[in-house]
Regions:
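A short, N-terminal "cap"/entry segment at the start of jelly-roll beta-barrel domains
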Residues: 1-44, 59, 125-133
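A short hydrophobic beta-strand segment most commonly corresponding to one strand
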Residues: 47-50, 94, 108-125
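Short acidic-glycine-tyrosine-enriched beta hairpin
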Residues: 82-98
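Short, charged/polar surface micro-motifs in flexible loops or helix N-caps
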Residues: 40-43, 52-56, 73-76, 84, ...
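Short, conserved beta-strand element in jelly-roll/cupin
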Residues: 49-53, 62-78, 116
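Short beta-strand His + acidic residue motifs that chelate non-heme Fe in jelly-roll/DSBH
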Residues: 58-60, 78-79, 95, 101-108, ...
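Short histidine-centered beta-strand/loop micro-motifs
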Residues: 36-37, 57-63, 85, 104-106, ...
Length: 133
């Protein structure tokens, strides 16, 4: 077998550390990308651990990728064209490609969550609103 992006294609690849990525929105959020365009060269999927403080919010977006989010701690508020979902610890939300969504962490303590994007997250395909925070 040949060499892939991360090494030999016939063996599992250990990713020892994530890449810390600058976040959009107010009140800095920590993004640790484990798999994706930046840390591992994956273009078909990205996996990131997010830590968002109380009061964090980002601009609305209409991404070209599906985003699957599992909340590990706290509550993640997901605004969408049909209303609002409060996603709590142990719950998951799926935002389909092309849907308008906006994420916030309004409650004390913020939230920790895992975001999986298919295909991988890209600033060029997230399509953030220009007129929101």
């Amino acid at each position: 077998m040949g060499e892939g992006i991360l090494g030999r294609e016939d063996m599992p690849t250990l990713i020892e550390n994530p890449t810390i990525i600058q976040a959009a929105g107010t009140t800095p959020k920590k993004i640790r990308e484990y798999a994706g365009r930046v840390n591992s060269g994956h273009t078909q999927v990205s996996v990131a651990h997010m830590t968002s403080p109380e009061g964090w919010e980002e601009p609305g977006q209409r991404p070209e990728f599906e985003e699957i989010t599992v909340v590990l701690r706290g509550m993640l508020r997901v605004e969408h064209e049909g209303g609002v979902l409060d996603v709590r610890e142990g719950q998951m939300v799926v935002a389909k490609a092309g849907e308008w969504i906006r994420y916030r962490t309004p409650e004390p303590g913020g939230a920790d969550y895992i975001a999986v994007c298919v295909p991988a997250f890209s600033p060029a395909t997230v399509h953030r609103d220009v007129d929101s925070p």
